[in-house]
Amino acid sequence: MTPQDLKDVMSSGLLSFPVTDFDSNGNFNAKGYAARLEWLAPYGASALFAAGGTGEYFSLYGEEYGQIIKTAVDTCRGKVPIIAGAGGPTRTAIAHAQEAERLGAHGVLLLPHYLTEAGQEGLIAHVEQVCKSVKFGVIVYNRDRTRFTPESLAILAERCPNLVGFKDGMGNIETMSAIFMKMGDRFAYLGGLPTAEVYAAAYKALGTPVYSSAVFNFIPKTAMAFYEAVRTDDMATQHKLLKEFFMPYLKIRNRVEGYGVSIIKAGAKLVGHDAGPVRAPLTDLKPSELEELKALIDKLGPQ
């Protein structure tokens, strides 16, 4: 897939980040992960992100990364494109991006670097080195310590033809407007705030109609229905689902830092697609919280 092909894929439809399956000892469960992807692939997502934030990229080590990407690529070949996550220190991000390309992934989402602060010149150097280390398309993730100005993105766009996507996880309306006005159709734009459905209509108004859905991991039918409501400006359906599911869901998710991933694995377990526990430092939902989540899921009906 060429960078332009990746940009085209990222420009429409719903995206999602499958959770990564671990066994009871916390080791990668390739069989379970393949079964998960086989279940999710037919629901119609434009692309799936392997080893992304929801896939606990931050906890992976050693050979696990390659095993996860290979399992995803092999399982979804001919069904749905696979975009690999890569991040952390520049050399780690480069190594993972190159491995993902070698294994047949269709592009890479460049996740934030770790721990240290960096100015715009440093961020530009980081992204440029990763982009120039691979031939396939790169999407940069704007969040946490990795926050780009419109001017920095313009420099990167000129230097890196294979940088084709911008995913926003900050939600700063003024900055997003400035980026969109400056860069126009040079990038595909993705909404990437946690529980993106809550912000989907606002992002669409900014020129960013595409977003990644975490709840697709356990309520894929509802996730696709919500995306269709956003696409067609069906506000009645959006408001109904926001009121009945997403807003009470947020109350559970926001109780503990890190629950943004934990609640997704909990949901998958409740619908019969258990992905195992989250890895430390994340913690799983408490039994009472599982019951709360189950009640919300049950109201939605079969998926």
Swiss-Prot record:
Family note: Belongs to the DapA family.
Enzyme class (EC, first level): lyase
CDD domains listed in its UniProt record: KDGDH
Keyword Lyase among record annotations: yes
Ligase as UniProt keyword: no
PANTHER family for the chain: 5-DEHYDRO-4-DEOXYGLUCARATE DEHYDRATASE 2-RELATED, DIHYDRODIPICOLINATE SYNTHASE
Pathway: Carbohydrate acid metabolism; D-glucarate degradation; 2,5-dioxopentanoate from D-glucarate: step 2/2
Organism expressing this protein natively: Delftia acidovorans (strain DSM 14801 / SPH-1)
Pfam family, one: DHDPS
Record key words, sorted: Lyase
Enzyme Commission number(s): 4.2.1.41
The reaction(s) this protein catalyses: 5-dehydro-4-deoxy-D-glucarate + H(+) = 2,5-dioxopentanoate + CO2 + H2O
Name of the protein: Probable 5-dehydro-4-deoxyglucarate dehydratase
BP-aspect Gene Ontology terms: D-glucarate catabolic process
